[in-house]
UniProtKB/Swiss-Prot annotation:
InterPro entries: CFAP144. GO terms for cellular component: ciliary base; cytoplasm; cytoskeleton. The keyword Cytoplasm applies. It comes from the Eukaryota. It is found in: Cytoplasm, Cytoskeleton, Cilium basal body. PANTHER family: PROTEIN FAM183B, PROTEIN FAM183BP. Pfam families: FAM183. Keywords: Cell projection, Cytoplasm, Cytoskeleton. Residues 77-97 are annotated as: Disordered. The keyword Cytoplasm applies. Belongs to the CFAP144 family. This is Protein CFAP144P1. It comes from Homo sapiens.
Amino acid sequence: MAGHPKERVVTDEVHQNQILRELYLKELRTQKLHTQYHVNPLRKVHRITRKPMSWHDNLEEPADARFLNLIHHAAQGPTKKYPEAQTENQEIGWDSEALVDPERRDHRMNHFRVYSDITLYKAKMWSLGEDDRHK
């Protein structure tokens, strides 16, 4: 049945010590202390490259004009690099100029915020905490 406690087996300390000793000796067999080091001739050797952004490594090198032009050309936006859009996604924002010159004084298209006495009064009331905006 599930409720009965099991009897504890008394551990033999001599037997437990013998098990721990065998475990310790097995671990010592797998460990090896390396005191002599050498290069493995079968391993591929990779050349360590210099850091491209460090200033002290690049002092003696002259600036390559062709490489600098290539970097500056790659940093430009696609509209400056190409005369036409190269992909369909570029076509969406390719012509960023307005089709119609915006006339700021034309009130038919430009609805600027106009402040009068009543709008300033109501804005002040709302900022002070009046919450009944439906009156």
